[in-house]
Amino acid sequence: MADGDSGSERGGSSGGPGGFSQHMSREQETQELATKRLDIQNKRFYLDVKQNAKGRFIKIAEVGAGGSKSRLTLSMGVAAEFRDYLGDFIEHYAQLGPSSPEQIAQASGEDGAGGPGGPRRALKSEFLVRENRKYYLDLKENQRGRFLRIRQTINRGPGFSGGAGGGAGLQSGQTIALPAQGLIEFRDALAKLIDDYGGEDDEGVGLGGAGGGGGGGMYGELPEGTSITVDSKRFFFDVGSNKYGVFLRVSEVKPSYRNSITVPLKAWGKFGGAFCRYSEEMKEIQERQRDKMYERRGPGDRERSLGPGGGGDDSETEDVDDD
């Protein structure tokens, strides 16, 4: 176990006897399974795997030099997507060359304060939307260097018991800033926790958001997500569950945008059949097009395509007859 500055709910103000009892209730209901501490530059990061009645989730806490904390909460499914996104950011960061002083000054803004809010230009951006939570990932640069800013916003709509002031449509947010030099170490630590504790994945598990921990409870296991890369696009296939049942989320990701669709389990067979049918039809179309192109070629073109002497087998036969 790490020290008392872990990413758990310790250290927060109780806000009176009622708040203290609620805090103790949360501590009793939520179990901490594992924690990992990372020291990157002058910051400490804690990755805590927790479990409550709805399942497992990961809390990420950033502790600054002055002791200030920022926390993010990820379901195991979202954590797996973060792991994949971190790989993309690591690859993009590795391809970036050194910045000129003019570029750094432009990226840092006029004040040059060097804080997370200073940069105006993102080198690479991605975002995720899951139930009532949104996650924004921006690779930025200021006078202190390059870093990945991760911001989480929560829509505390009707029925969300997230504390005082949780009116309809109210959003609260937390932000952490991860130095780019620590991206690989952070990704590897997150991946290890997912590998060790991510077997009970659920789309909204443990987060207390709308639709979390519903109809997917009957499934003790769901297929693992995967991704494929085609040209400049990347497609993610993630299986999740909510109160409506099991679904497949297919996400199309390009450097400039991300789009996704959700397919319920009962439609998977129809989707798969449609893909297979179109794949076979396109193969037949391509074969017919190749045949037509071959027929359009004249005899001279076909002979040239066979190489010098026309057919190699006939040439060898003639040599044998001469002997």
Swiss-Prot record:
Residues 1-34, 100-122, 286-323 are annotated as: Disordered. One of its GO terms (biological process) is positive regulation of transcription by RNA polymerase II. It comes from the Eukaryota. The modification N-acetylalanine is found at residue 2. The keyword Nucleus applies. Transcriptional regulator which can act as an activator or a repressor. PANTHER family: PUR-TRANSCRIPTIONAL ACTIVATOR, TRANSCRIPTIONAL ACTIVATOR PROTEIN PUR-BETA. This is Transcriptional regulator protein Pur-beta-A.
